[in-house]
Amino acid sequence: MHERMAVPSVETRSSWTVATVVLVILALSFGAPWITIIALKPIAAELGGLRSVPALATALAWTGFGAGGIVMGYVAERAGVRTTVILGAVMICVGLALSTGGKTWQLYVGQGLFVGFLGVGGMNAPFYVYVSRWFDRRRGSALALISSGAYVAGALWPPIFERAVAYAGWRQTMLYYGLFEVIVIVPLAAVFLRSPPELPLRLGALGALSAPNTVMGWPPSLVFGLIGAASIFCCIPMAMPQAHLPALCSDLGILVSHGAAMLSVLLGTAFVSRQFWGWVADRMGGLNTVLTGSIFQILAMAAFMFTQDEIGLFTVSAAFGLGFAGIIPAYVLAIRELFPAAEAYWRIPALLLCSGSGMALGGWIAGALYDHFGTYAPAFAAGVAANAVNLAIVGALVLRQRSRAARLA
């Protein structure tokens, strides 16, 4: 922290204006995949009856925007984030239109390639890099704010989509939403997404803990690989309630509208608590925040295994949202703390590819296990096991970081 105070800050009122606009754009772009989640049962009924089909489409969207973030992050570094965001908005619209075609392959390509890879992929990872360059002192809080876009989308859109699907069908809902997000995102990007200020050249916040060409005394590739693996294993359980909560409620005889409201509660509490986790991350550091959030997540995930009533599920959903919300931005903050700023444009998208792959895998595993067992209990058990692996990896990194700091103190 002393090193941060030794140079002038780049943070201004414009920094927070940009972060707020980015939050709005992400809340709109992340709305697109939620249509498939809310309409999981009717889409499955029209495409062969297997829930793993729309679950895989959602998984492809998660994987797509993770992989697309690497490619589009490279494009944004050279052509500007405004270009990738405008392109992404148009591609989301195209992908939603293609998904309504009635064929399984159209759903997969529409969600995976257009909505995921070219659409959200052109916004999510490039925005993390872009916004991190507008901040130096409250970077954790800013990253927490923009990373809440997915949770604003999850809190806002499921009840709206549930009513829209019931009234007009999932196809019309996709078509109209695609047009709406283009009409809103393109002007916002054109007006507000200008070049960020130049950051002073300096070491990361934890640079003193690393010798040249090492991170915490380990090879950078090893540390980055461990962080990436940890993000995969933490996002497998993270995705399961988000992707299958409405369907779980329907199976238990709970109204679909209540299931959508439950999802909104989960993601609404995640949005609120993520701002708190950002404040914590600015003080504890990225890895310590990841470890703390992962402990809360595994406890809430275990509670899903033993909860069957509506009030209990609302309570567990809120607890899950409060616990897991700060994990992803804390991973990004850890990357900015541990690695050179010049490497952010590819390390952050690569990290988000890992986390997105974990989200994709978690959503698909839950659907596949449900199709095999006829219940979600095995899926939640698998989620708890994956979370335990995550805790082991992050715990090892935190212990290494603390021992290194103690040795240099």
Say what each PLM segment does.
Residues 67-105, 281:
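Conserved MFS/SLC helix-loop-helix module at the cytosolic interface between two early adjacent transmembrane helices
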Residues 174-191, 378-396:
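Symmetry-related core transmembrane helices of the 12-TM Major Facilitator Superfamily/SLC fold
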Residues 36-40, 222-275:
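Extracytoplasmic gate region of multi-pass secondary transporters
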Residues 17-51, 69-72, 157-158, 240-246:
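Extracytoplasmic
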Residues 149-197:
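Helix-loop-helix hairpin linking two adjacent transmembrane segments in secondary transporters
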Residues 27, 95, 106-122, 232, ...:
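Hydrophobic core of transmembrane alpha-helices in multi-pass small-molecule transporters
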